[in-house]
Amino acid sequence: MAGHGAGGRRASTSRAAARRVEAETNENDDLAAAAARDLAAAEVPAEVPHFELDEDPAFWKDRNVQVLIRIRPINAAESTANGQRRCLVQDSSKTLSWTGHPDTMFTFDHVACETISQEKLFGVVGLPMVENCMSGYNGCLFAYGQTGSGKTYTMMGELSKLDNELSKDSGLTPRIFEYLFARIKEEEERRREDKLKYICKCSFLEIYNEQITDLLEPSSTNLQIREDIKKGVYVENLMECYVSSVKDVMMLLLQGVANRKMAATNMNSESSRSHSVFTCVIESRWERDSMTHLRFGRLNLVDLAGSERQKSSGAEGERLKEAANINRSLSTLGLVIMTLVDVANGKNRHVPYRDSRLTFLLQDSLGGNSKTTIVANVSPSICSSSETLSTLKFAQRAKLIQNNAKVNEDASGDVMSLQRQIEDLKDQLTCLKKQQNMPGSPSFKLLKSGYGNEFNSLHGVDDQSACDLELLKQKVIHLEDVLVGSLRREKSAETEIRKLECEIKSLNRLVNLMESDTRHLRTTVKLRDEKIRRLELLADNQISSDGYLMDENAAMFQEIQLLQEQINDNSQLTQFALENKRLIEQVRMLEKFSKQGEREMLLTEISLLRNHFLHILEQKYARPPKNMEAQGDVTIKELETCRKELDACLENNVLLAREVNKLRCELKQYQKCGTGQVAPEVVESSVIPGINQKQHDQAGWCGSYLASIDVERQFVDVGITTDITESLELTPPSEIYSENQDSPSRLHFSDPEICDLKNSTKVLEYNSSRNLLDKGIILSGQLENECGLNSVQNDEISLVKENAEKMYGHDEISVYRQNEILHSSEQLLQDELTHIKSLNEGLKEKLIIMAEESTKLSEIIVAKDVEIATLSEEWESAIVDLTSFLTDGCSSLDDAYQNIDNMISSFPYNNHSVSEHVEKAMKVSIEKEKIISRLQIELQAAQRMGREVKEKLHILRGATLAITEAQLLDNDESQEALKLLDLMRQKDCTVQELNDNVKQKSCLFAEATEGYSRHECHLPDNVGTVAEISHNRDGSEVNQANTHYQAKLEDVLHLVEDKSNKVLALFSNFEEAQETMEEAETMLSSLLKANEELKLEKDSCRQAVELLFAERTSLINDLQELEASNSFTAQRYDKLHEQVNGCVAEMTNLATIIKESFHQVQRVTTVELFAFCSEVISFGQDLRKWIYESRSYLVNMGALLEEQGNSYAEQNRRTNSSTYAGVSQQVESCSRQLGGMNGDIFPGTYMVVDGKEKASVHVVPFGSNAELEDTNVERTFDMDYASLRREFDRKSDVAEGLSFDLKLLQESTSQAKDMKDKADEISDALVSVQRELEKKTSAMESILKQQKVLEEELAENGAALLILRSELEHSESLSSELFKENNNLKVMLEEEAMMISETKAMLEDKSKVIEGLEHEILLLNSSEEGRLMSQIKELNDNLKIISIDKGNLEEEILKLTDKLEMAVALAEENEAASIEARQAAEISKVYAEEKEEEVRILERSVEELESTITVLEEEVCNLKEEVRSYQIYKKSEAEQAQEMFIVDSTSKCDATEQLCPGRCQLEKRLKAEIIAHQDARRKIECLTMEASCKDEEVRQYKEHIAELVLHSEAQSLLFQEKYQEMEHMISKQKFGLHESNSDTGHTKFEKPSGRTRGSGSPFRCISSIVQQMNSEKDQEISVARQRIEELEGLVCNKQKEICMLTSRLAAVDSMTHDIIRELLGVKLDMTNYANMLDQEELQKLLMASQQQIEQSKAKDVELDMLKEQFDHLIQERDSLFDDMDQRKADLLESQLLIEQLEQREQMLEAQNGILQMEKDNLQQRIMEMDEEIQLLVGSNQAIAETTFQMGSNHRSANSEFSRRLAQSDMLLSHARHEHSRLQAAKSSRTRRGSHQ
């Protein structure tokens, strides 16, 4: 990647240099050429390929989720921004590729390209959805994608309709509903017979900011989602509208779309800001077979709001809040889909449906009962590549969801409504029958009129053709066939019904038997439980044996009494039996009566009527027909009426059959309530004969014929009773079936005869058959009346049955229970043991049978598996052959078609025979194609069958496996023994194999030694031949054969050389053998040493094992003691706890009681005291008031008495002195006047005073007047005194009462004091009780503390126990490991012994070989050839040298082994280093990411610079436009000046008149030019100011970039230093500190995550980055210090742990000594198993060695992997450093570019200065022109010359100005190109960084 990036950068820099050169060379080109180049640089849009969508009608059969990707075209904004650059490429109609890094391919169900129309999309997506919803499935279709990807266009599109047709841009929703209502109309018309009706309900809602709003009723907001068991998830108070056409749906859609939240963003002009859900519920209802079927489907059409980013959409304020809510709900949707995918993969996950309103509402659509289609909309433009990728990943995850769609159908009809309907139909039937039978009914009249017309027509017929007769005959035959078929169907239905009834009866009997068995079992179980309970009590000695026997006798006596009572209560059984006998006799009598000839008479009459009917028909058809047309119409009408009546009869039959079935079901239900239904059936049988007798009496007027029919029906009714009675008497089912068969067969036999009679009455209208017809009508009416009477009687019978069943149900149940109790009590004791034994034996037999069956099944399954495998192979081969044959046939057919076409085209003229042959061939080929297609279908069917068979076999395998597992569980011990035997055999086999291998190797070695000896044997023969030749050389033949000898000698020399070479080879082999021997010796020595060491280790291990066993025993004893103590302490603790709880409960109860009593006493006393005190206080106050009042009253009375006494004294004095005279005079006058009336006065005075004081009254007449007055005064005084005395007495009485009350008050106060004293005593007692409570609570607390201490001790003991157990386990594991090592060592020793013996044998062989070689060497020494000896010496020297080298090599091998160990240690350290290096790499990755963020911030700053540059460019363009306008203005002025000169030259005489206005115009123009120049100057000054500002900003940017570069370099240096320090620490660190290093690594990894991102502006970001870098340095220093401290702490902890381990090891050693002691005792018992253990140990050692070898190999592999990972990490680090260097280079390049831009800006400033200078020059020239204009007034020629010069100067100035402007434009375009190149390089760099 780095290489590619460097190459790309070099290429880009070279291209930039080339562009610069071209720009410098083409500086003088004009603006048009630059514009043309820009247009040529733009990309030309490539043609998008078109892929058609594949429609798969069988897709939804086995799948429930469909995912479709829709790609929208690139819009204008995207094309202007990025051209036609794409991030997606469609490969096919189901695949597309993402062109980013890395290139990824996605596969979906459908991929819709940019050119797919809305109609085609609806055909693939919407149409199947409608079909599924009409079939009763729930459906959901929702569009997903980013904002502006075309979701709303896909779902809604254009909702307007043109000419009642949808436009081509209409979305899926209107098209779906258009097709839906068309299908509804079609289905309703097609299924009109089923009364199919569809109902559609629609609702429209939106989810805006996680609040649900009804779009059809916008006032209802914030609706709530509810969940119901029946409804599922629904929205509360949501408006649902019924729709019946597309127009209604369009109105709702328009209304909802108008109310939906829409807003404009940067990505879309009309962006939907909410999720909308349009729901349609489609309900269909139809009737079939008197059942109402209901089916409904829910269709959800969801338009999701798009996911968006704030940067791209520019959302602010409310739009930003909306975007946040939308993204939240969409992220929840993605999370739900991810969890659903995990659930589909078999993981247990919680699906967070309720985290969002959208997912909660679409719960069924996502992983529920629905067929769901997801349309993912994507944009192919490169600017939205990340959103497109996320959408594709979302769709790929959604494809893995698994829904479970079901048909929502309810086929349960309303039973009550059906029953009512049956009753209504019954009533209608009876009414119709009555109306038809009545003579005044219209049907009767119609019959008569019809018969009269037919009679007239028969008499007045004309001669017609015989064809009409044949037609009528055919119609009649057809009707007769229809009647026969209907009767046949009825008979078949009746037979099926009877069969089902028999089956139901048998099943009921079985059910009753099962229930009786269960009841018997329950009673037996209860009795057994009671007996067991008694026996347990007897066994526990809770009841004595005598008591047990007494209890059992009493219980048995009670049971016997109860049974006797039940038998006595059931005295009615005998009565029922007698009634049964009587009813059976009646039935027999009725049967005899019916058999005596009534049925035969009826049959004879029917046969006579049938013959008569046939005779009439023959006469009718024999006569010549007249007026056949009218007769044909009448017959047709009659046939239609017959057909209608037939249909009605059939319907009635069906209804009656259903009623019969229902009645039978009810009877069965009643029968299930109790098996012995004797009483009700007897009552029924007793009631029915009376009813039948009534029926017979009522029907007596009908004659013998009707009486016979009545008798027959009575027989039928009585047949029912006989059935019931026979069922009670337990008759066989065949007889019941025959009895049931008789009654309906007779009825059905009479029904067709009656129909024949009716038909005969309708057809026959002759005079001769009039009487028969009338008779038939009367009979039919009577029969129908009888039917009605029978129905009434049947109703009465059913009522009587119900009453009887209700009355006798209780008696039946009681009788049944009594029978059960009797039966159970009689057979209980007898069958108890036998039943249990039989059950056990049966279970054993079943187990054995099941085992045998399972084995047989397993064998059969294995055989079947083999057969299936062979069949599947044959089938696959056959399929391959068939497919190849079919493909070959297709190819041959194609070739034949081509050949035929070629032949036809080759013929010059049309030949009919050829065309016929061609057509035949075509037909044959078509037929073959059909055959091929049929074969393919059959192939597919066969494949399906094969799959089904495989599945069934798989199920059978599972069952057999389950059975075998059950058997295996039963036979575990035997299997383990077999396994051990197998292991032993395997071990024996392995030992034999090893012995065989050793023997083979020894044989090979022997063969090699024999070959070596043969070669050595050949050597002396050769030497002997050479010696013989030398001896013969001294002979006489030497001279003769000199030449020949020389040749031979040369040959021999060659042979000798060859042999010497062979000898050298042998010596080399010998040296190798010596080396191997030496190595074997060294190995032997090392093995002997190792063996001795192993023996020592074995002894030590044995000792350790003995110690461990001893420790184990001690630990076990300690554990047992601890457990015992623990149990004792636990018991003690429980007792204490119980005591404490009891004490606490008692104390709490006492406290509560005392508190309650104290509170009650306190309340009572306080209430009484308060009441008494208040009474006392009120009474005292009243006393005080009364005393005070009495005192004041007495004082007043005394004062009044004194005043009255004084007044009386004064009055006496006055009366005595002054008034005495007047009184006397009055008295005298009175006496005079009254002188004559003394007699009247005295009695009057006496009468007046008599009631008061008689004495005074008597004194009055005898005293004088003065005395009378005195007496009056005295009397008044006496009276006053008496009244005062009375008051005084009364007051004294009151005072005494008050004193008594005071005494009572004193007593009450004393009582109150006593009560207070008592309350104080009670309070003291309470205080004492509280103190006692506190003491007891303190005691309780102490007890609880002790309890806690005990619990802590228990916990510590438990922990100690756990520790001891863990140590025990550890010691056991150590002992087992040591045991295994001992076994391994034994095996190694044995192997070494074998190797030693083998090496000894080899050494002996080699010693023999050496002796032979020495002998040969001696022989060679004795020979003449010294060269060989010298060579041998040299060889010996070489051997010595080689042996020395070998020793050196061995030393080097030892060194290498040491190095290898060091390398292993280093590798382990390198592992730790690699771990830390990974952590460091992760930290560097994080650091690189932070740097990338900084680079992004710099890129943002560069973007801001780019924006400023664009602003400057715009201003420069504006200047250019102003300059151009100024040039145009100058040109126009020059043209006007030329025109003026021409005018002046032509009219010299009028020059003086025209000078004044021309001058004025020139002055005005000059002023305008001056103003324009001033404006231009101002603008230039503004531009210079802005340029200076931009220079300052660029300078600041440079400074900041330089600081950033310095900081980054410093950071990289610090990072390198830290990395080196880390490596140094890793090299120094020990192996035990890896975990701490990993922890610190984690802390380091977590450290940079706390870094905060910078702010928006680049300057703040740079300053924050500097601060962050400083803070990071401080943090890293602190982290390093912490790490040092942690390492020191870890060292201390490790030392402590080492101390602990040493102490534990010492304890373990002591324990092992004890264990070894115990093992010594155990060894005596293990002598018998020594051989077996040795073999097992051998095998274990072999296995352990193999495991060690495998572990070493695995460790080597892991080391290699770690090394590779380490190398990979190093490469990643290098790549990171390279990236850093590249970024530095990029920064430097950016700095250079910025400097170049600054230079260009300086150039532009210089050009601006030059332009200003030129402008000043122009102004000066304008001034000069003004002066020249003034001079023009003098002379015309001077004016012409000056104007001409001015024009030329202006043109030259304008040309120079335009040239400079062109140069500035070129520079600007060059800068723009450079800027775009930099942008592209940065974008590519960021992509590479993100991919890396």
UniProtKB/Swiss-Prot annotation:
Example GO molecular function: microtubule motor activity
Sequence segments annotated as region (Disordered): 1-28, 1633-1656, 1870-1892
Keywords: ATP-binding, Coiled coil, Microtubule, Motor protein, Nucleotide-binding
GO BP annotations, alphabetical order: microtubule-based movement; mitotic cytokinesis
Pfam families: Kinesin (PF00225)
SMART domains found in the cross-reference section: KISc (SM00129)
Domain Kinesin motor positions: 64-401
Matching SUPFAM superfamilies: P-loop containing nucleoside triphosphate hydrolases (SSF52540)
Binding positions (ATP): G145, Q146, T147, G148, S149, G150, K151, T152
InterPro entries cross-referenced by the UniProt entry: KIF15/KIN-12, Kinesin_motor_CS, Kinesin_motor_dom, Kinesin_motor_dom_sf, P-loop_NTPase
Entry GO CC: cell division site; microtubule
Coiled coil: 406-438, 486-526, 1066-1139, 1303-1357, 1396-1528, 1780-1841
Record keyword Chloroplast present: no
Residue spans of biased composition, Basic and acidic residues class: 1633-1649
Family annotation (PANTHER family): KINESIN-LIKE PROTEIN KIN-12D, KINESIN-LIKE PROTEIN KIN-12E
Family indicated by similarity: Belongs to the TRAFAC class myosin-kinesin ATPase superfamily. Kinesin family. KIN-12 subfamily.
Protein name listed in UniProt: Kinesin-like protein KIN-12E
Protein species of origin: Oryza sativa subsp. japonica
Gene name, Swiss-Prot/TrEMBL: KIN12E
